[in-house]
């Protein structure tokens, strides 16, 4: 605890010196990941190009296995979205998240409220598929959109889990906020880092006989 306090005091003093001298010193963020609605870790200096801190809490289901996780790290501000995002591929494969992005030292040391997980179908549908180890995804199934999901997404690229890198592609329903994600972005989740080569996001078509 004493060493942690000394380290934090040093970082604060270093940041103040950088500000006074106009040196443009790198950002420092809390870095951690873990199960539950919060996590705590060490303050780390962000690498070049990463100019934001993020804290993200997510609730996900993978083939029906549910989990709640929290992630804190450095990332590029242009890739960071503050707020709620929901995606659904199948009734048992989905993720909802709430995130906060900020640009001052240690600004992600707190927590964010857990996302509201409304699984009520809203009548919209999107092409759906999950294709690990693949670059494309046919979308021959249909995802039933829930809650505030009004858009269809098609994301593809590479995913990193620790030292493992592999291809992935997926399609399904999403909230409009998912459209913030663009091709070329690095998108974090609790235990994975996605490098997107494709990030399509379009309004979901209304079913026949149903107008806007």
UniProtKB/Swiss-Prot annotation:
Q: InterPro entries this protein is in? A: CNF-like_PLA2_Inhibitor (IPR050918), LY6_UPA_recep-like (IPR016054), PLipase_A2_inh_N (IPR004126), Snake_toxin-like_sf (IPR045860)
Q: Indicate the secretion signal residues.
A: 1-24
Q: List the disulfide bonds.
A: 29-53, 32-39, 46-74, 80-101, 102-107, 126-152, 145-173
Record's GO cellular component, any one? extracellular region
Please state the protein's primary subcellular location. secreted
Q: Which residues form the UPAR/Ly6 domain?
A: 27-117
Disulfide bond as UniProt keyword: yes
Q: Where in the cell is it found?
A: Secreted
What's one GO MF term for it? phospholipase inhibitor activity
| Keyword list, A-Z | Disulfide bond, Secreted, Signal
Which Pfam families does the annotation name?
Answer: PLA2_inh, UPAR_LY6
Concerning its family, UniProt says: Belongs to the CNF-like-inhibitor family.
This protein's name: phospholipase A2 inhibitor and Ly6/PLAUR domain-containing protein
């Amino acid at each position: 605890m004493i060493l942690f306090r000394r380290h934090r005091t040093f970082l604060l003093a270093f940041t103040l010196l950088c500000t006074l001298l106009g040196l443009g010193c790198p950002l420092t963020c809390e870095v951690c990941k873990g199960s539950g609605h919060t996590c705590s870790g060490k303050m780390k200096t962000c690498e070049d190009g990463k100019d934001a801190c993020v804290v993200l809490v997510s609730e996900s289901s993978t083939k029906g296995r549910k989990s709640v996780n929290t992630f804190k790290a450095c990332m590029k501000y242009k890739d960071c979205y503050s707020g709620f995002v929901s995606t659904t591929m199948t009734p048992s494969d989905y993720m909802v998240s709430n995130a906060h992005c900020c640009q001052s030292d240690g600004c992600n040391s707190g927590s964010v409220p857990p996302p509201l997980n409304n699984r009520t179908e809203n009548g919209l549908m999107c092409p759906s598929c999950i294709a690990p180890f693949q670059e494309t995804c046919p979308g021959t199934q249909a995802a039933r959109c829930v809650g505030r999901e009004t858009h269809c997404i098609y994301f593809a690229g590479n995913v990193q889990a620790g030292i493992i890198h592999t291809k992935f592609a997926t399609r399904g329903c999403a909230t409009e906020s998912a459209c913030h994600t663009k091709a070329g972005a690095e998108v974090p989740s609790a235990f994975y880092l996605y490098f997107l080569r494709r990030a399509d996001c379009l309004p979901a078509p209304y079913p026949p006989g149903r107008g806007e």
